Structures are given as structure tokens and as C-alpha cells.
């Protein structure tokens, strides 16, 4: 699901070849109507000569959207007499770079991921005057944003969405396994046990499921956290202290997962990262996997026969319901910036409907909507195979649920405690021991 590139791009881009196609077309479409807006903003430079802004964010999987963001930033800068630079880092390098900038300076605007607003709360400018109007005029925040975008009563970043995954599957192989409505994923509503049963038949036919359970930031927690919640367990209760992980229903759910892993999955997945399942799916090795729409976009470019045979379903549900692990991404301003007024002016402009809408639509559903207005946006109806992604925000929970997505939740995530609980269970075969281990690890973090 995730695209872990090495190094940063500044001035020129380095992208996977299969995503370069169509960039020009998207760029032209996204630019339509932008110039008049810029001319309105350019009546006179708003800031003193020599003002500079540096923006840091994670690299984009959808390359044309990254190109568009750079153009938007540069044109606003030219219209307002501000020199803007944009850096895009591979995802694992983003947080360390932000930490360095907090200490020594260097960036004005940074992209924050889940829990980072808590981590750097003393170093961020309150931007409620930008975020709240954006949310209100667009129908309010989606659930996952509402749960996480504030630290107490402070708004320390402006939410712009989240990229997430669903269950990609091969239509023909699900048909062979007897799955009803296999040709239309939007009509399929499965429990985990039903999903495992289909996988068992697919594996018997030589087409196992695939799931990454290694130390990787996207796909492993993207399945393990929702599965945990769907069987009634949580890291902590609402008080943010009481461990709620070792529950009988979850232990039983883990037993079902162990059985499903053996019956339905490629068992080498315990060592897979976010890229292994992409390759396995695109090579025809597996019939279904949790992944972002990146697999589908890649297939449309390089493997059209696989794209034609691919659809998506919502993540399965358990006895406690259906859940998605979603964390809010925000654009934040560092307090040590020497150009806070310019940074706020840029964000206020970028989050206007025209600029934000063009950027969000250019990703064709890869980025989930942060506000409710975009639930009915035409982009969701261009390709029926993307329909399940539109529904995900209503099921979103954050890391650390039912407590806040704070530093402790981020630490538990970074240590892969929930993911390793699943890996230990399928490797050792003892659900109870694995869950007890996970609960003990969580106590060490939340008990501090």
C-alpha cells in the first residue's frame, strides 16, 4: 500500500514509472481556472521583499497531485512576493525531519500524521481561524477527523484527509470460490469469518490471500487495529489509561485469525512489508489483500487485465462492528517559523474550495475526504470500483481508541505492539499467550 521512497525531491520529482502516465493530462485539468484566482490574489505583494516559506510533507503516491501542489504553491508565492520551496520526503523520514526542524528550524509548514499534533503540541501555532471555517463551510468534519484533529481545545493543524486501504480482490477467483456478487464489490458485505471462508476456497484453488504482518507503517496496522476493534478489544478505555486489550472475545477472535491464516493466506506474510503484497497481487500470486487504491492504479497502468479483474470491498466486520484505522493528516505551522503570517495566509488560500478541491480531486479517491461535503463529490462516481473508499470515513477510529490519539498511542504504534501480537499468534499458534503479551507491552507504555 505504502510507497516508501528514499530521499527527498526538491525542484524535480522521482516517481514510479507506472504512475507517470497521465500526469500531463491531470495537470492541465487541475490547472483549469486557477490563473484567474491567482490574478485576483496578485493585486500587490502582501509581504515584504525576501519573505520565504519552506513546506515539508510526505511524498505522494499519485505523482500528478504532487506536481499540482507544487504549482499551486509557486503561483501563490509569485502573486504575493513570497519565495516558496516544497520538499517531499519518503514517509519514514518525515517525522525525524520534523523533529529536527522543531529543534533547529528550517521549515515553516509541515505535514503532520496521526498523533504528531500531540507530540509537538508545544511547538505548533493554533490555526483554528483557518481550520474551523474550512470545516464548517464543507458540511463539518468526517468522524475520524473529529476524533483527532484537536489537542484539547487547540487546533494545531488544518486537516486535509488520509490515504487508506480496502480489500482488493480478483473478481474471477472470488467467483470460483462461490462469493455472491463477486462482480460488484459494493454489494458485498462480509464478516471476517466469511472472508476467511472465501480465502480458504481460493487457497485450495491455488490463489491464497495475502497480508503483510511485518514492521511496516501502513498495511499491517491497517488490518490488525480494525480486527482488534471488531472483536471488542482496544488498547485502552476512554480514560486513556485502563488497558482493554486482553478480552475473552478478542482471544476467541485471535483463534479464528490463526485458523484463517493457515487456511486462507500465504503464510510468508509475517515478514511482508507494505510493498510485498503489492508485488504479490500484481504478479497473480494472491487473490485478495488489504491495500490502498495504489494496487488498482498500478494495474490500470501496467496490468490492465488484472485491473479489469479487480474490485474492492469494505474491510470485513466482527461481532463489535466494522472499523477502519484512520489518522488525520494536517498541515501545521511551526512556532519557530520566522514567517508565520505568510504561512497562515498561504494555508488560508490553499484551503479555499478551488485550490483544495482541485488538489483532492486530482487523486481520484486515493485521499479520503476530511469533510462531509466531499462524500457526494463527483470524483467518487467516476469509477464504481472506488466506491468502497468513499464509505470508509464513517467507520474510522484513531490509534489509541477509545482513548486519545496521543503520544502514548503513537509510541505503541511505532513499536508495532498490536501488529506483533498478531504475528506472534500465527507463528506460535497460541492466541491467549499472544494477547497476554500484547496487553503487557501496552501496560508498559500507558502505565508510565
Where are the predicted features?
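Short, solvent-exposed loop/beta-turn-alpha elements that line the ligand-binding surface or hinge
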Residues: 44-48, 128-142, 183-188, 211-213, ...
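Short, well-ordered beta-strand elements
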Residues: 49-61, 83-87, 109
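Long, aromatic- and glycine/proline-rich binding clefts that accommodate carbohydrate-like moieties
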Residues: 47, 52, 310-313, 362-420, ...
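Extracytoplasmic/periplasmic solute-binding protein
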Residues: 152-160, 165, 193-243, 249, ...
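Hinge/lid segment of periplasmic solute-binding proteins
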Residues: 44-47, 112-166, 196, 223, ...
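Extracytoplasmic "Venus flytrap"/periplasmic binding protein-like
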Residues: 71-143, 150-157, 172, 176-182, ...
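Glycine-centered hinge/linker elements that transmit conformational signals in sensory
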Residues: 194-202, 239-271, 315
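N-terminal secretory signal peptides
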Residues: 1-17
Amino acid at each position: 500500500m505504502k510507497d516508501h521512497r528514499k530521499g527527498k525531491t526538491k525542484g524535480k520529482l522521482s516517481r514510479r514509472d507506472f504512475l507517470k502516465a497521465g500526469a500531463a493530462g491531470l495537470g492541465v485539468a487541475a490547472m483549469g481556472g486557477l490563473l484567474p484566482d491567482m490574478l485576483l490574489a496578485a493585486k500587490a505583494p502582501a509581504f515584504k521583499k525576501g519573505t520565504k516559506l519552506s513546506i515539508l510533507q510526505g511524498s505522494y503516491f499519485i505523482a500528478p497531485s504532487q506536481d499540482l501542489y507544487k504549482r499551486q504553491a509557486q503561483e501563490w508565492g509569485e502573486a504575493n512576493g513570497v519565495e516558496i520551496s516544497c520538499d517531499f520526503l519518503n514517509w519514514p523520514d518525515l517525522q525525524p525531519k520534523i523533529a529536527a526542524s522543531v529543534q533547529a528550524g528550517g521549515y515553516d509548514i509541515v505535514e503532520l500524521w496521526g498523533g504528531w499534533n500531540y507530540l509537538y503540541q508545544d511547538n505548533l501555532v493554533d490555526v483554528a481561524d483557518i481550520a474551523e471555517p474550512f470545516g464548517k463551510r464543507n458540511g463539518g468534519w468526517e468522524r475520524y477527523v473529529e476524533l483527532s484533529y484537536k489537542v484539547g481545545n487547540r487546533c494545531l493543524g488544518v486537516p486535509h484527509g488520509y490515504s487508506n486501504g480496502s480489500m482488493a480482490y480478483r473478481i474471477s477467483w472470488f467467483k470460483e470460490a462461490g462469493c455472491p456478487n463477486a462482480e460488484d464489490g459494493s454489494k458485498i458485505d462480509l464478516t471476517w469469518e466469511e472472508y476467511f471462508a472465501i480465502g480458504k476456497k481460493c487457497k485450495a484453488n491455488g490463489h491464497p490471500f495475502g497480508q503483510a504482518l511485518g514492521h511496516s507503517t501502513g498495511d499491517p496496522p491497517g488490518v490488525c487495529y480494525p480486527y482488534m476493534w471488531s472483536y471488542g478489544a482496544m488498547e485502552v478505555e476512554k480514560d486513556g489509561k485502563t488497558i482493554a486489550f486482553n478480552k475473552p472475545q478478542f482471544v476467541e477472535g485471535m483463534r479464528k485469525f490463526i485458523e484463517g491464516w493457515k487456511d486462507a493466506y500465504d503464510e510468508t506474510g509475517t515478514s511482508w512489508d507494505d510493498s510485498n503484497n503489492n508485488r504479490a497481487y500484481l504478479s497473480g500470486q494472491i487473490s485478495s489483500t488489504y491495500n490502498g487504491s495504489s494496487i488498482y492504479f498500478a494495474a490500470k497502468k501496467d496490468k490492465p487485465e488484472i485491473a479489469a479483474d479487480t474490485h474492492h470491498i469494505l474491510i470485513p466486520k466482527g461481532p463489535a462492528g466494522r472499523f477502519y484505522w484512520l489518522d488525520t493528516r494536517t498541515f501545521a505551522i511551526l512556532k519557530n517559523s520566522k514567517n508565520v503570517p505568510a504561512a497562515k495566509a498561504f494555508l488560508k488560500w490553499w484551503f479555499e474550495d478551488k485550490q483544495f478541491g482541485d488538489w483532492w480531486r486530482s487523486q481520484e479517491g486515493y485521499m479520503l475526504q476530511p469533510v462531509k461535503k466531499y462524500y457526494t463529490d463527483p470524483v467518487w462516481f467516476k469509477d464504481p470500483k472506488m466506491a468502497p473508499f468513499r464509505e470508509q470515513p464513517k467507520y474510522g477510529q484513531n490509534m489509541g481508541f477509545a482513548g486519545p490519539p496521543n503520544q502514548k498511542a503513537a509510541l505503541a504504534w511505532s513499536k508495532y505492539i498490536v501488529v506483533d501480537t498478531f504475528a506472534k499468534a500465527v507463528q506460535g499458534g497460541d492466541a491467549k499467550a499472544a494477547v497476554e503479551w500484547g496487553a503487557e507491552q501496552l501496560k508498559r507504555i500507558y502505565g508510565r
